[in-house]
Amino acid sequence: MLAHAGYRRARTFFTPANAQSYDRLARSATFGRDMAWKREIVRAVGNANPVLELACGTGILSSMLASAGRHVVGLDLTFDYLRATQRKLELPLAQGTAEVLPYRDSSFGGMVSSYLAKYVDIDRLTDECWRVLRPGGVAVFHDFAYPSDPAVQGLWNLYFSILRLCGKFASSWKVVFEQLDDVIRESRWESRIQASLHSRGFTKICCNYHTFGTAVIVRAEKP
């Protein structure tokens, strides 16, 4: 049973109460950048097929991958988010965690995730990715990051202070708005996942920062 802090936090953040408003929030809270980052993920995974999306949520990225001709399989921790995906798309879905995947070895040509890495046990994630990917398979991870530029940090901190105030008027997102900035600051997931991927045997590992360093995409291949 998973009991680490990231798992508990994800359970607290993503609930039946906010599943229906997630898509709208993802667009507005990122000023539309969410779609731009997801387009980069689709480009990064290339022609890999089939593609497993971890933490598929309400199916935003899965829809984009399917439109690009990928055969998509989705997995998410929260049942109500999977139901939202099911209303949009016909694709195989499963409820579960990224650290214990319910799939056979070498099942996928690609694996993607968006907004997952800061919540998981990184080493268990990369172990499972290695197991379910075929040789030549591609893994793409995307999530928020704390910017390194002091000027951008100032704006970032101001934005999240405003977001905390907004939580007073959006009860289903209150906990997220109050805690997300601390989660992002403490995570530093991009450096940890690159080290873990390298240790596990992945090659061609690359890390690209986006939107003034506030988001990161890490890509790797299984030789």
What label would you give each PLM region?
Residues 6-9, 145-196:
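C-terminal alpha-helical "lid/dimerization" subdomain adjacent to the S-adenosyl-L-methionine
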